[in-house]
């Protein structure tokens, strides 16, 4: 089953180590909405939990995180969203 663009954004941030609170701040959505998106991703991918969902999505879309980094000029140190 295909993920929505917002679900892809959420699972990408989960894969990058963002907490639910950080995802909400970054995407300007509530904590509850973040949880809803994560729950939908887990169901769609038939995963056991969020970590398993990331692993499944990474397996299906092998270049997914690399493309995200290239498109957004991210580095591993660029995630200080709560310190703004």
Where are each of the predicted segments found?
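Intrinsically disordered, low-complexity Ser/Thr- and Pro-rich stretches
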Residues: 16, 28-31, 68-75
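Poly-acidic low-complexity segments
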Residues: 12-15, 63
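Short helix-to-turn junction characteristic of helix-turn-helix DNA-binding domains
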Residues: 14-18, 57
């Amino acid at each position: 089953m295909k993920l929505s663009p917002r679900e892809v954004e959420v699972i990408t941030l989960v894969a990058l180590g963002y907490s639910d609170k950080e995802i909400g701040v970054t995407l300007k959505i509530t904590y509850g909405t973040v949880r809803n998106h994560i729950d939908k991703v887990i169901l769609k991918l038939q995963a056991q939990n969020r970590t398993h969902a990331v692993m499944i999505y990474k397996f299906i879309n092998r270049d997914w995180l690399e493309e995200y980094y290239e498109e957004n000029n991210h580095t591993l140190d660029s995630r200080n969203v709560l310190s703004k």
